[in-house]
Amino acid sequence: MASALCRTASRLRSVQLFRRIRVSSDLLSASSPSPACISDALRHGDFSLPRSFFSLNCGIEMLKMDQRCLLSTSASDTTSKHDSGKPETKSSEKNEKSGGSESSDGGSDHKNERASGKDVRGGPVSWMSFFLLFATGAGLVYYYDTQKKRHIEDINKNSIAVKEGPSAGKAAIGGPFSLIRDDGKRVTEKNLMGKWTILYFGFTHCPDICPDELIKLAAAIDKIKENSGVDVVPVFISVDPERDTVQQVHEYVKEFHPKLIGLTGSPEEIKSVARSYRVYYMKTEEEDSDYLVDHSIVMYLMSPEMNFVKFYGKNHDVDSLTDGVVKEIRQYRK
């Protein structure tokens, strides 16, 4: 807009200048003195110039002034054009820069969107986090699995030590005792040394469990002899000393096996041997003033040195009891 106004002003000045030049030329042609007039003036010494000459002089001066104005106007137009061109260049550069920045911003936004998209889909950071999580989980699973296996192995080793180790057996179960045999003789653990022995704790008034266990023991004794050729001594120890006299025990054991030895004693002696072999027993009162004895149902296999080897519960039948004892005897011989 400014450049258009400058061009219009310069055109108007040029038109005015052209008109002034025409007027000045007309004046010069109309009122210029002739050579005769000039020579007469010189002869008479009249140096006064005619009025037209002054008009011409004024016209020339005005022409110079208009020319300077024209030059200054053209210069100002050029300067204004140059100045107006610079802001456009700068503005264009700014626009280019802003466009570049916008494009760079757009690129950065695109990168950000891609980065955010990678995070959602699983970029490098997410995969690394997943890998660390997986490695940690696998390590924990491996650690707990290893600890579990180690714990199971320790339990198995301890079980084997309790079942097979003589030192562990002596410390846990067994010990010296002094009781009365069913033939009336007092015996100790030393009288049973030299042979394999199976001890069972019960009482003669037991209605069902004790008879069943003693029948199983008697059958196993014979089968052990057949399978291994080893004579195992079966021993019955009463936990009811108040009622189980020597005679009562003698009659009771002979009902199951001829080799079965019956032992009894005073309440203190029975209590001591039961404590040594970790046997539980307790009287239970009945309505008819009679009582039963609640006790542990366990058979103890003792080595020829009267060291504890292994125990067998009620869950073992004749065959499993026989196989277990034969296995322990063969392992002992090795």
Swiss-Prot record:
**GO cellular component annotations of the record:** mitochondrial inner membrane; mitochondrion
Q: Where in the cell is it found?
A: Mitochondrion inner membrane
**Membrane association type:** Single-pass membrane protein
- Residue numbers binding Cu cation: 206, 210, 295
Protein name per the record: Protein SCO1 homolog 1, mitochondrial
Q: Where is the composition biased (Basic and acidic residues)?
A: 79-99, 107-120
Which source organism? Arabidopsis thaliana
Q: Which Pfam families match?
A: SCO1-SenC
Matching entries from PROSITE patterns are given as:
THIOREDOXIN_2
Q: Which family does it belong to?
A: Belongs to the SCO1/2 family.
Report TM segments. Answer: 125-144
Question: From what superkingdom does this record's organism come?
Answer: Eukaryota
What does gene deletion cause? Embryos arrested at various developmental stages, mostly at the heart or torpedo stage.
